[in-house]
Amino acid sequence: MNEAARAVAVLKEKRLTLATAESCTGGLLGKLVTDVPGSSAVYLGGVISYAYAVKERLLGVDAALLQEQGAVCAAVAGQMARGVRARLQADVSLATTGNAGPGTDEKNHKVGEIFIACATKSRCTVQKLELSSSRGENRAAACAAAFALLERELEEP
């Protein structure tokens, strides 16, 4: 069973819903969830927020934070996760933001520097990844790590 299938199974078992907010993964997280038969029982939907304006308007990410630090930081990942969870009224959410490569971004973040976040009603956990593969492999690894984070967070009391 792959990471997405395991995550969907855990969500079903716990009767929880999921929403996603994606930047660097560009919808891959949502695609992997919806590849799982029966995922409609738990997956509400997602926001692909590549542009700062979308992060601000749809997810409630602080504009000043984006201007000062750029989108590749723990605080933005956390705000994305909390924002999509609230906006879609989900029990739990996942968010991804970072630089998948191949070049650096406007704030010169390293290629492979990606932040993933998982928000529940009671907390939001952010994890930094430092990946070193191709763009596609970095995006896939970020998704796998996000699903693993979700599983860990749902095991916590």
Task: Name each model feature, range by range.
Residues 1-157:
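Short alpha-helical segments enriched in small residues
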